[in-house]
């Protein structure tokens, strides 16, 4: 697996879960002898929703909600077979979306 790179993107609504999962991935990769770049924090996406409170009139009465999507990027350079096996067996939090690409 020489001259390869594994790029891992993590997404989630809770930044603490993402940071914890990122720390587990980095620790596992370093323990198996791979070179790690990151974690790199990517821009947080903020989605804002405005909802009318009143069912009929009073347009001034509104509630505002915000949904933040936090993202992190980890590059594993020159992974070994042990690294790939350890990452496959890694159990991450349920609130974290993981995308893995080989390059």
Swiss-Prot record:
Xref: PROSITE patterns: RIBOSOMAL_S10 (PS00361)
Alphabetical list of InterPro entries matching this protein: Ribosomal_uS10, Ribosomal_uS10_CS, Ribosomal_uS10_dom, Ribosomal_uS10_dom_sf
Signal peptide: none
Residue ranges that the Swiss-Prot or TrEMBL entry lists as coiled coil: none
GO CC field: ribonucleoprotein complex; ribosome
Keyword annotations: Ribonucleoprotein, Ribosomal protein
Entry similarity comment: Belongs to the universal ribosomal protein uS10 family.
Subunit structure comment from the entry: Part of the 30S ribosomal subunit.
Protein name: Small ribosomal subunit protein uS10
Record gene name: rpsJ
């Amino acid at each position: 697996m020489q001259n390869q790179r594994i790029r891992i993107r993590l997404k989630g609504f809770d930044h603490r879960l993402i940071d914890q999962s990122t720390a587990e991935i980095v620790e596992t990769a370093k323990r198996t002898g791979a070179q790690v770049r990151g974690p790199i924090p990517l821009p947080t996406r903020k989605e804002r929703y405005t909802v009318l409170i009143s069912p009929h009139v009073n347009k001034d009465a509104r509630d505002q909600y915000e949904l933040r999507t936090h993202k992190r990027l980890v590059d594993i350079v020159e992974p070994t077979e042990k690294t790939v096996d350890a990452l496959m067996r890694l159990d991450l939090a349920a609130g974290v979306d993981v995308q893995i690409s080989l390059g």
